[in-house]
Amino acid sequence: MKTIKNGVYPTMITPFTDDNKVDYDGILQLLDWYKYRGVDGIFAICQSSEIFYLSFEERLEILKFIMANKPEGMDIVASGHTADDLETQIKEARAFIETGIDAYVFISNRFAKEDESDEVLLKNMKYVAAAL
């Protein structure tokens, strides 16, 4: 990955059709909307995108679609390692990074359970970062 440019990076929602499927035409409209407002990039796969309600396969498919249709010059930032275990988090993060995104954002609360110490969080975060 590279250093992303300074600028505006709004979070992107995931639009759905009336029958609760991902609305890919809606995603195209959102990409155009962001383009014409001059944003520097979008945070495409994030909590605003309903990542905890989508399967890994759905999140990855959406991200690949966004990467294939993003406006020229627009940076794409993503997240989405929602699994409880670290090995699956690594697999998920690696798959998102391999789409060619410009930056990946870790979800810090996925690295330790609520009753675990800060030391566990830091150890797990370093482990995942080193694996990527």
Give the location of each predicted region.
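Active-site beta->alpha loop and helix N-cap motifs at the rims of alpha/beta catalytic domains
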Residues: 2-132
